[in-house]
Amino acid sequence: MEKILVVEDNKTLAKLIAKKINLELGFEVEVAYSFLEAKLFLKRYSYFLTLVDLNLPDAPNGEIVDHILESGNHVIVLSGNIDKTFRANMLKKNIIDYVNKGGVDDINFIINTIARLKKNKEHKILVVDDSMVFRKQMQSMLENMFFKVITVAHGEEALGILNSVSDISLVLTDYHMPVMDGLELTTEIRKKYTKNDLTIITISGDNDDDTTAMFLKSGANDYIKKPFSKEEFSCRINNSIEALENIYTITNHANRDFLTGLYNRRYFFNNMFPYFEKAIADSEKFTIAVIDIDYFKKINDTYGHEIGDRVINNLADILRTNISQDDIVARFGGEEFCIVLKNITPEQALSRFEKIREKVQNTIVSLENEEKIKFTVSIGVLLHPEETLEESINQADMLLYNAKQNGRNRIEHN
């Protein structure tokens, strides 16, 4: 478990902050009430970050901030007196942020800031600028915000990275660059990635007011004019990443089955139509199967819908853990699921589904009264898909029907 160090001489406040961080974010939190205690902790451990009171009894002039930065730890400064002079002095240092410690809202802000930094570790940012000095400056600021950073010198290199690295969240690009400038890059990126997929922020010293509108109309999410403060930079980056996460959350809810967390029927067809056409055109071997729980109505009638839901979730877990990352499994509704195994031979597909059938057959669902129940599935496997996706699903359904008619707990294939 990652650790956070809180350094604050007000013991009540320090304990309150530590407790909220532990309960809400899951970090192990250690508390020091003086500069001396903090030094002892820092000698023994490294921390995800430190929350540091600027004015301690044995370090009244903020000496602790420089000491912790020199030790290689990240710092968020706590202060009860934030004014323009304070801001200017703090922003000269390589701190993450500063926070007022006046009340409950300030503590909530601390929690939100740490939560944001924790999430930032999951994101990659691509910095595109022909100035090595500026690239390194951007990289340093972004890494201090816990982002993973890739840097390149121009637009063509950026497109190459985007083609080979699939999980980039944000592109931070300069305008004027050799080979391919930022505007051309933005236009090219938007041919492949929507604003729901990837955020683009332009940074430029161009003083023409039309430039901002030009970039925004070409698909940029935001535009930062040089020179800018570190504070403005971090706020804009964090806000853009948070907006992207919110879009992902909304989209994910729309695409997921509420009970199992698997994809739903809507997502399956939206995703499968383009894949199906390309796979047929490329002669890619793939398999479509429809899976149904045997005697599910009897399970519901005998044990109730809560147990029925538990059985559905048990099957969902088995399906989820027995497919590869590229395959698709979706709950079509009720007790019926559909699976597409990609880049697989018929022999391999049948072996995989037999393994799934056996795992389900051997699964035991324990009830609260210590009773145990078992269930089975029937599977219709289409090894050689039809001309269209709809025809293929219908054919797999017919094979499933045959499996039911021929005794259940079995696989039928074409």
Question: Which stretches of residues belong to each language-model region?
Answer:
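Short regulatory alpha-helical coupling segments
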Residues: 251-252, 265-285, 316-324, 342
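Conserved nucleotide-binding and Mg2+-coordinating catalytic segments in signaling enzymes
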Residues: 251-270, 291-305, 313
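Active-site-proximal structural segments of metal-dependent nucleotidyl cyclase/transferase enzymes
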Residues: 271-303, 319, 330, 349
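Hydrophobic framework residues that shape the active-site pocket
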Residues: 296, 315, 329-332, 337, ...
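Active-site-proximal alpha-helical element of nucleotidyl cyclase-like catalytic domains
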Residues: 307-328, 336
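Catalytic-core segments of nucleotide cyclases and related cyclic-nucleotide turnover enzymes
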Residues: 350, 382-413
